[in-house]
Amino acid sequence: MTTLKAPELLLPAGSLDKMRAAYDFGADAIYAGQPRYSLRARNNEFKLEQIGIGIAEAHQRGKKFFVTSNLLPHNDKVRTYMRDIEPVIAMKPDGLIMADPGLIMMVREKWPEVPIHLSVQANTVNWAAVKFWQQVGVTRIILSRELSLDEIEKIRQECPDMELEVFVHGALCIAYSGRCLLSGYFNRRDPNQGTCTNACRWSYGTQASATDPNTGEAMAVPMDTDFDFAKSQQEAEQTFSACGDGQRHPEADKIYLLEEKGRPGQLMPIMEDEHGTYIMNSKDLRAVEYVDRLTKIGVDSLKVEGRTKSLYYVSRTAQVYRRAIDDAVAGRPFNPELISELDGLANRGYTAGLMDRRPANDYQNYETGHSVGHRSQFVGEVRAVADGWAEIETKNKFSVGDRIEIIHPSGNRIV
């Protein structure tokens, strides 16, 4: 009987406390980066001093610490990057996560001994691209989230000597593996410089349009007109022209049909609430049920997204995915309780993404831009225990009579 190799469990860390929690709850490695050069410029406590402390603690515990440098730099950051990464490399991180070919070339030339992991930002979707990067000297590929399980398996078969990393949990981007321009367009904040404002999560109002019979120009159709979105353009114009009584008619409904010009006839219903509509809001990735398959494929590392998430998020995801990996290696069947434990985290609804090629509307949450989970609320962190008393740093309100789950590396209990 062949013994399966356990994939590395890789967790995010936005602070030293979150790094320690990730290790305590089962992570083999964490990733963190300098705010200026990673894609998390906000809510990121890892300055140079913290990176040094983190790397030292990781190695003392037999764990790994990867430094994220996956921005796509403009000219002014190329020179400063090489200057600022030098003291980081002197601290002996276990690898750099990078996306830009130019920076990869420069790091390889100056520090050829440093392992380079190719970021998901590089959009690696086939085995030929993996071989290309292998020839360049990259030691691990973080595969694009757009791949199915079968495609991942094919890459493993064609590239048996390359380390492969796959995202299994966390936020998904509407754009192709994070290459999004929305934030730059609306706020002049470049997502690929680490300053994404998550414009895809905002609510967007919609209005129908019709041609002004006098000018021939497009004009908005007020919601109090008798406008049927299923009618042809000609019928819509006639309806708009004929209706001027200012009354909202029964057949008018706040249900819109969105049609992409390149796919005529494929209508997508858009629901609007009092805040707007959410046509770009992706659900969150949850692939815990596929850990067994990914382990059998031979994926080297399973990654959780979320450097800006809470300590509770880091602890829970580390604990759940650790159990899933251990079960897969031991040959135990998948435990559905792991899904319910992840359901308690704040989330936008879950999807397995493109791993199992579900219908397209399974990936998006059109109803709301806010969390649809959050059945559990993070109420506090135990900071110290002495003489039977616990010092708790409160994060949210809780009251006498509330059921509180205490999660601990040795086991959870409800009090």
Q: Where on the chain are the PLM-derived regions?
A:
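Surface-exposed amphipathic alpha-helical tracts and adjacent flexible/coil segments at the periphery
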Residues: 2-25, 29-36, 55, 61-85, ...
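Glycine-rich, positively charged N-terminal anion/phosphate-binding segment
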Residues: 40-57
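Alpha-helix capping/helix-boundary segments
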Residues: 102-103
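Basic, amphipathic alpha-helical recognition segments used for DNA target recognition
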Residues: 106
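Conserved nucleotide-cofactor-binding alpha/beta core module
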Residues: 126-128
